[in-house]
């Protein structure tokens, strides 16, 4: 079979480091009857060892040439191939609690993570290869430089941990950035639940719109000083100083006032 060339428009960098591949599969801990979805199987580096342990493996792939390759693999009878754009994929269309895994295309990682947050209630866990800088933002704590909108929104849905550092030479072609594997487990006992999630999401987006400004300035169209102080937020603080649960509390307080 002719060699597949990585396509830049699909953000393709193919994992080839056998140690990293083994570490990822061990982290996923696949059991035969698990419902597992792999995003972007590529040249099947993770697909093959997963398929060996599973009765069935769902794969989502946009590249038609790779889809054709997948159909010729010795374990193709174990694969359920979903050809198309993962940003349009209906994860709820696959029954059961799911494990989701993948070497995510870095050019769509943020919108894809937000999409996956919407199906968190039907997920056991997720393991993703991402740009290391993105993982650092996902797991960042308040008062750190990496803490921002992405971290607040994903920490609302998931407990997250950076598991594996992955250097550029682990891929072909080698990306220009370091990568990392993150584990994401849906939060079972949330500190606070947003009464109006759309309002909460809008509030967080506004809060981090201009990082150097105070929370008072960034949220002036939604909240006054009295509102901020009512939930224990100092109006002079910047957005990165405020914990996720404080954003939830503020959103609920403002939503309650509007009723």
Swiss-Prot record:
Gene Ontology, cellular component aspect: cytosol
Molecular-function annotations in GO: 16S rRNA (adenine(1518)-N(6)/adenine(1519)-N(6))-dimethyltransferase activity; RNA binding
Organism, as annotated: Neisseria meningitidis serogroup C / serotype 2a (strain ATCC 700532 / DSM 15464 / FAM18)
Presence of the UniProt keyword Ligase in the record: no
NCBIfam families named among the record's database cross-references: ksgA (TIGR00755)
UniProt keyword Coiled coil, yes or no: no
Function, as annotated: Specifically dimethylates two adjacent adenosines (A1518 and A1519) in the loop of a conserved hairpin near the 3'-end of 16S rRNA in the 30S particle. May play a critical role in biogenesis of 30S subunits.
Subcellular location(s) per record: Cytoplasm
Family statement: Belongs to the class I-like SAM-binding methyltransferase superfamily. rRNA adenine N(6)-methyltransferase family. RsmA subfamily.
Residues where S-adenosyl-L-methionine binds: 13, 15, 40, 61, 85, 103
Keywords from the named record: Cytoplasm, Methyltransferase, RNA-binding, rRNA processing, S-adenosyl-L-methionine, Transferase
Catalytic reaction equation(s): adenosine(1518)/adenosine(1519) in 16S rRNA + 4 S-adenosyl-L-methionine = N(6)-dimethyladenosine(1518)/N(6)-dimethyladenosine(1519) in 16S rRNA + 4 S-adenosyl-L-homocysteine + 4 H(+)
Listed name of the protein: Ribosomal RNA small subunit methyltransferase A
Enzyme Commission identifier(s): 2.1.1.182
SMART domains (alphabetical): rADc (SM00650)
């Amino acid at each position: 079979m002719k060699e597949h060339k990585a396509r830049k428009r699909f953000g393709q960098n193919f994992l080839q480091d056998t140690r990293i591949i083994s570490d990822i599969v061990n982290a996923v801990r696949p059991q035969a009857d698990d419902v597992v979805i792999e995003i972007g199987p590529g040249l099947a580096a993770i697909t093959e060892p997963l398929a060996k342990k599973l009765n069935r493996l769902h794969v989502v792939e946009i590249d038609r040439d790779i889809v054709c390759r997948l159909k010729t693999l010795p374990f193709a009878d174990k694969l359920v191939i979903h050809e198309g754009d993962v940003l349009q994929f209906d994860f709820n269309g696959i029954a059961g609690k799911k494990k989701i895994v993948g070497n995510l295309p870095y050019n769509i990682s943020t919108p894809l993570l937000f999409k996956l947050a919407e199906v968190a209630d039907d997920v056991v866990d997720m393991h993703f290869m991402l740009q290391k800088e993105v993982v650092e933002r996902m797991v960042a704590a308040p008062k750190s430089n990496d803490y921002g909108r992405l971290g607040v929104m994903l920490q609302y849905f998931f407990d997250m941990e950076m598991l594996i550092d992955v250097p550029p030479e682990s891929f072909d072609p080698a990306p220009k950035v370091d990568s990392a594997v993150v584990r994401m487990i849906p939060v079972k006992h949330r500190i606070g639940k947003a009464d109006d999630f759309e309002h909460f999401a809008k509030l967080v987006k506004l809060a981090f719109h201009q990082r150097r400004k105070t929370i008072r300035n960034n949220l002036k169209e939604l909240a006054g000083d009295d509102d901020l102080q009512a939930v224990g937020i100092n109006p002079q603080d910047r957005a990165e100083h405020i914990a996720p649960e404080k954003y939830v509390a503020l959103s609920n307080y403002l939503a309650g006032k509007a009723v």
